[in-house]
């Protein structure tokens, strides 16, 4: 089967959003992973519903599907990266993150996006209390999204409270309707699952998928061919399980070379997929 590829806009921050979308479409991508941020579709700028309606028309005109990503570094706090989170100690801070995620759900509903992806946050020393906060927050967001027919997917992130797929499974058992946002590169940084095994084991629960190369045991997103990932095995697994959702390249530190990397990375993935035999 043919996989559907997208590219995360966090790797296109030197491009205006309209130019970035045109680059993706012209390069042959099927969609975009839209990270709501100061550079692209700022959710706190005026007239978000009107801008979302215009963006949907643009996406439809280019033939691009979408997922909404929520990992902006300084959108909520210009002085603390990725703060606040669902496990922040201050209740008002947690409420700010929940409100932001609900706004992202609204954007996803307006765009007709396939999913909204988000992560847990780095826990305090009291992991039991942090876990309780996480379950409460995710439950609230998933319930809000369900009323709007939007899929929520939590992404295991190395070093966060949901660090790997096993942590996600525990969370999903507590929050019905939650899906998995699987960044396959993270699997070789933490956890016991090989990336291709994770794809196969969690195929029915996949809400969003990201791919990139990555050095083993180091959380560095790299272009295909620049790390230790067995990308053919991951692509074969996605194909074997019949994954029909977007497979999003996340190269957030490569905006300076996006003009050449966007088409080159897609060509590399397609070549690897064509050479990946089914298992």
Features from the language model and the residues they span:
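Active-site-proximal loop/turn and secondary-structure-junction residues that shape catalytic pockets
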Residues: 11-13, 36-38, 72-74, 120-124, ...
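Active-site acidic/histidine proton-transfer and metal-coordination neighborhood
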Residues: 18-19, 61, 75-179, 279
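A short acidic, helix-capping loop that chelates divalent metal ions and anchors anionic groups
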Residues: 39-43, 78, 85-87, 124-128, ...
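Conserved H-loop
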Residues: 65, 151, 244
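Histidine-acidic metal/acid-base catalytic patches
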Residues: 1-6, 13-30, 54, 60, ...
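Residue-level preference for long, well-ordered alpha-helices that form the structural scaffold
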Residues: 44, 48-51, 90-97, 127-130, ...
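N-terminal pre-domain/capping segments
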Residues: 1-104, 109, 146, 266-279
